[in-house]
Design a protein with these regions (language model features):
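Catalytic donor-sugar/metal-binding loop of nucleotide-sugar-dependent glycosyltransferases
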Residues: 101-121, 126-130, 134-139
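Conserved core of the sugar-phosphate nucleotidyltransferase
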Residues: 8-11, 20-109, 113-114
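Glycine/small-residue-rich loop that forms an oxyanion/phosphate-binding "nest" at active or ligand-binding sites
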Residues: 1-6
Length: 139
C-alpha cells in the first residue's frame, strides 16, 4: 500500500471478515488504545473468557485429565481474569510489520481492547452464519 500511495502509514487496522457484528465503537476503542500506548506493537480485540485455565479448563495427560494450571481456586471469580482473542480487530504498528523477524504475534508487546462477547461469532460454517443472524436481530 505504501508503494502504491507513496505515503508511509503509522499502523494498519485488520478487520476480520468473519466477525461482522463488531461495531464502529469497537474499532474506535481499539485504535484509541493504540494511540494511548505507543509502547504497544499490537492491540488485539478480546472478550472476557467464559472458561478459565486456573479453574475450569483441563488437558488430557495419558489416560486421565488434569487442570491446565494447578490452582486452589474454588470459583472462577477468584481466579485471574483471562480473555479470548476474538480475531475481530488487530491494530498493528508499522514498525512491527517492517522490522519484526518473529512471525508469532504473541511474542510482541501487545495490549487488548475488550469487546462484548455477543458481538463475536467466527463464521466458519452455515450454522455459525444462522447463529450470527439470530444474534444480530437482538443487538
Amino acid at each position: 500500500m505504501e508503494t502504491r500511495t507513496g505515503k508511509q502509514y503509522d499502523a494498519m487496522i485488520d478487520l476480520d471478515i468473519t466477525s461482522p457484528l463488531r461495531t464502529e465503537q469497537d474499532i474506535e476503542n481499539a485504535f484509541a488504545k493504540a494511540q494511548e500506548r505507543e509502547d504497544l506493537q499490537i492491540i488485539f480485540s478480546v472478550c472476557e473468557a467464559r472458561r478459565n485455565p486456573w479453574f475450569n479448563m483441563f488437558k488430557i495427560v495419558g489416560d486421565h485429565a488434569e487442570m491446565v494450571i494447578e490452582s486452589q481456586f474454588t470459583g472462577r471469580q477468584q481466579a485471574p481474569e483471562v480473555y479470548d482473542v476474538n480475531a475481530s480487530i488487530y491494530v498493528i504498528r508499522r514498525a512491527f510489520l517492517v522490522d519484526n523477524p518473529d512471525p508469532i504475534l504473541w511474542h510482541s508487546k501487545f495490549g487488548v481492547s475488550v469487546m462484548m462477547d455477543t458481538g463475536i461469532i467466527d463464521i466458519d460454517s452455515e450454522h455459525d452464519y444462522l447463529l450470527m443472524e439470530a444474534i444480530a436481530q437482538h443487538l
